């Protein structure tokens, strides 16, 4: 160990190199610090972040794991690694390291656990983790974000009254967040409260007009309300914004077109839906109905 250059001075020098964009020089200094001070996590964090910038995630994870192998009780490094894995969409590994932490000691770890389970679509475990988090942490900026994820989870579990309850709690802070308004729209739609649903969908669109998903739900809601022209417009906007619209959305668009007597358009959209999904029964029936209308076999749908 070089006692003429104490840790803090050498760490500051490395960070200065990094701030100047001299990442290779900084990396070399950080790695020397790790060799000389393997018990100090600061250089480990900095190397992991430099590796992340270079896309070298595996090396960063291995480095942080090596620290924990020597100091498995270090909660700060474990939490850092959990967040690092989370940030890089490595959900299973994040869970492995975050589960080690006691919720009462590191409540935020339970939030990250819930988020990881949510991303893995393990909704029951996600729900348990997030409920645990909000029971422990009564005063935190993450509380209302946890409510948003709980609302999403309850939608996936088809428990719409519970979803509405969590959405209303999140609304205290996030009333102008487009996604929360979309959550309200989806929840109200599934509860049959279409007048409420349409207001939420329209607000979500106003807040984020370039986000596709509110247009899809607006289309569904307008269709239920019998406003077929707005349903058609919404579905078309959704298709415009998304690269790979599925068969269901083309089927819904075609059905809206039938309602406003755009039978040729409807037939074209039904054919697109069938091409995307050859087993789509609604598209098959729709093609037959549209063809019959165009041939005069049956009257236009009212």
Residue ranges and their predicted role:
Residues 19-20, 53-54, 87-88, 119, ...:
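Register position in tetratricopeptide repeats
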Residues 6-36, 46-53, 87, 115, ...:
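Alpha-helical segment of the N-proximal tetratricopeptide repeat
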Residues 7, 41-42, 75-76, 106-110, ...:
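Helix-start (N-cap) detector for alpha-helical repeat units in TPR-like alpha-solenoids
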Residues 36, 70-71, 101-104, 136-139, ...:
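Structural marker of alpha-solenoid helical repeat scaffolds
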Residues 12, 46, 80, 112-115, ...:
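Canonical tetratricopeptide repeat
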Residues 32-33, 66-67, 100-101, 132-136, ...:
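Canonical positions in the second alpha-helix
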